[in-house]
UniProtKB/Swiss-Prot annotation:
PROSITE patterns: G_TR_1 (PS00301), G_TR_2 (PS51722). Keywords: Cell inner membrane, Cell membrane, GTP-binding, Hydrolase, Membrane, Nucleotide-binding, Protein biosynthesis. It is found in: Cell inner membrane. This is Elongation factor 4. One of its GO terms (molecular function) is ribosome binding. It is a peripheral membrane protein. Its main location: membrane. Required for accurate and efficient protein synthesis under certain stress conditions. May act as a fidelity factor of the translation reaction, by catalyzing a one-codon backward translocation of tRNAs on improperly translocated ribosomes. Back-translocation proceeds from a post-translocation (POST) complex to a pre-translocation (PRE) complex, thus giving elongation factor G a second chance to translocate the tRNAs correctly. Binds to ribosomes in a GTP-dependent manner. It comes from the Bacteria. Signal peptide: none annotated. PANTHER family: TRANSLATION FACTOR GUF1 HOMOLOG, CHLOROPLASTIC, TRANSLATION FACTOR GUF1-RELATED.
Length: 601
């Protein structure tokens, strides 16, 4: 191992949402004097307004700290801040590949949660040295010994050295830094070997093009050097190199073991994919990093501007978003009901909410979003297989030989008293129980196979509400399985509204159709004629609701007298309504599209 690297430590922080990861990062920055008290705003590394507000980390961030340890040596610590949410699992795994160690933060009041576990296993897969930290010991309900035991039982890590800390109060921070220095191994790698570096994040800067966050494993990268990206063989010239300490500053070179920023005239963020390998164009390395994959979106929804005039603006906004987010995809689509818009693909539900919120917030757009759907695999009668992300594109029933839908393996961590409610929820969502094991006396881990389409709606919210917020969920894609699915169309006055159609399981179709019609009846305003709302599978109508018409009291000026006079007036009114119905079109409000989303309650 090169002597040069012995002072470098690359580490990340693993934690479940809200266990205090970003606060701990802030304290480390302050303790090492990287950030002055004046600059230290809360959650320093979460740059996006949205990240701060939701208290989650979306993009990976890095920062370099200088630290003088108790042994009198100066160390360079590179903290790689990873997203903790399950939607961004691939980004987490790439960030881990760039480290040698990880701080495992566990909340002293909550114990080990599902996402903590998922990330720990990933860290162990990458052979990282794990430093456990028990955070939030300043809270009255903290149970340090219980959590220590739990770390040993559930994860199987030795927790006798676990540092009790409180990031908020700044307790135990020095001890954590000492442990990083002594326990996390220094990076290996030869600065003179052919260049080999991994990209673990990239974003778009309007002045410099694509900025890549890299960890150099072998060799050295310098300005003016020609580099090659492994996955697409494209070559670029390095413009500038830098590190975040914590604000960007330029450096002359990045050597094996270092983490930094490379700017190299790359124009398209899709060229610099997360997990790709960078090497020297003149003397390339033998082989790339294993495990590179192009992330595929799992959840799709239509996004339409409420004002047709905003279409161009929406397109620009999506383009800018996709510059920073290579996992997000979009393509134009038209809907008879909603006009022109886009079909967007996301990694998962959180990702979808974030993208939609950023569109509305950063680009001030008023949008309608259709119900999220997943990618179905359709085999038609001729044997051709097609992937369909939009219910409107489903071929007619006669032509479908089989329909398959994606399934997830879900790991749910919960308190023992909530098991019944959670099992019931999973059963309702067509889940198949795979495993149930008790972790100690208070916690339980439940494993289920659940179709993605059932999770997409509001599974997460429901899980949180049946467990009073204590359950946590982690999932991975298991594969496709055949299912008895049908397309449910919604007709309004006999006209199908494409944006309201959904693909559902046949057993659920009646219930779902009825619920949908009832919901729509509440949100579609009364017209001058009656409006029929129907749910149909193919040509068979399975549910109907009617929105009654407004009517003027035409009999107000008849006093007593003959019934035939009244009948004449009523018949005349009826004729008029009938004529109106032939030419009238029903305005469908935004709430109607949201009604499709919230059917389950």
């Amino acid at each position: 191992m090169a002597e040069k690297n012995s002072h470098i430590r690359n580490f990340s922080i693993i934690a479940h949402i809200d266990h205090g990861k970003s606060t701990l990062a802030d304290r480390l920055l302050e303790h090492t004097g990287t950030v002055t008290k004046r600059e230290a705003q809360a959650q320093f590394l979460d740059n996006m307004e949205l990240e701060r507000e939701r208290g989650i980390t979306i993009k990976a961030q890095t920062v370099r700290m200088k630290y003088r340890a108790k042994d009198g040596r100066d160390y360079e610590l590179n903290l790689i801040d990873t997203p903790g949410h399950v939607d961004f699992a691939y980004e987490v795994s790439r960030s881990m590949a760039a480290c040698e160690g990880a701080i495992l933060v566990v909340d002293a009041t909550q114990g080990v949660e599902a996402q903590t576990l998922a990330n720990v296993y990933q860290a162990l897969d990458h052979d990282l040295e794990i430093v456990p930290v028990i955070n939030k010991i300043d809270l009255p309900s903290a149970d340090v010994e219980g959590v220590r035991q739990e770390i040993e039982e559930v994860i199987g890590l030795d927790a006798k050295d676990a540092v009790p800390a409180s990031a908020k109060e700044g307790i135990g921070i020095g001890e954590i830094l000492e442990q990083i220095v002594h326990r996390v191994p220094a990076p290996e790698g030869d600065p003179d070997a052919p260049l080999k570096a991994i990209v673990f994040d990239s974003w778009y800067d309007s002045y410099r093009g694509v900025v890549m966050l890299v960890r150099v494993f072998e060799g050295t990268v310098r300005p003016k050097q020609k580099i090659r990206l492994w996955s697409n063989r494209k070559e670029f010239e390095v413009q500038e190199l830098g590190v975040f300490a914590p604000f960007a500053k330029a450096v002359g070179e990045l050597q094996a073991g270092e983490v930094g920023v490379v700017v190299a005239n790359v124009k398209d963020v899709h060229d610099a994919k997360v997990g790709d390998t960078i090497t020297d164009a003149a003397r390339p390395t033998e082989e790339p990093f294993p495990g590179f994959k192009v992330v595929k979106p799992m959840v799709f929804s239509g996004v339409f501007p409420i004002e047709a005039a905003d279409y161009e603006q929406l397109r620009d906004a999506l383009e800018k978003l996709s510059l920073n987010d290579s996992a997000f995809t979009y393509e134009p689509e038209t809907s008879q009901a909603l006009g022109f818009g886009f079909r967007c693909g996301y990694l998962g539900l959180l990702h979808m909410e974030i993208v939609q919120e950023r569109l509305e917030r950063e680009y001030q757009l008023a949008l309608i979003t259709t119900a999220p759907s997943v990618v179905y695999r359709v085999t038609d009668t001729s044997g051709a297989v097609e992937e369909i992300d939009n219910p409107a594109k489903l071929p007619p029933v006669q032509k479908i030989a089989k329909l398959e839908e994606p399934h997830l393996t879900c790991h749910i961590h919960a308190r023992t008293e909530d098991v019944g409610a959670i099992l019931k929820l999973c059963q309702e969502r067509r889940g198949l129980q795979r495993d149930l094991k008790y972790l100690g006396t208070k916690r339980v881990q439940i494993t289920y196979d659940i179709p993605l389409a059932e999770v997409v709606f509001d599974f997460f919210d429901k899980l949180k509400s049946v467990s009073r917020g204590y359950a946590s969920l982690d999932y991975e894609l298991k594969g496709y399985e055949e299912a008895d699915l049908v397309k449910l169309d919604i007709l309004i006055n006999g006209e199908p509204v494409d944006a309201l159609s959904v693909i559902v399981h046949r057993e659920r179709a009646y219930q779902r159709g009825r619920d949908l019609c009832q919901r729509l009846r509440e949100v579609i305003p009364k017209q001058m004629y009656e409006v029929a709302i129907q749910a149909a599978i193919g040509a068979k109508v399975i549910a109907r609701e009617t929105v009654k018409a407004f009517r003027k009291n035409v009999l107000a000026k008849c006093y007593g007298g003959d019934i035939s006079r009244k009948r004449k007036l009523l018949e005349k009114q009826k004729e008029g309504k009938k004529r109106m119905k032939q030419v009238g079109s029903v305005e469908i409000p935004q709430e109607a599209f949201l009604a499709v989303l919230k059917v389950e309650e």
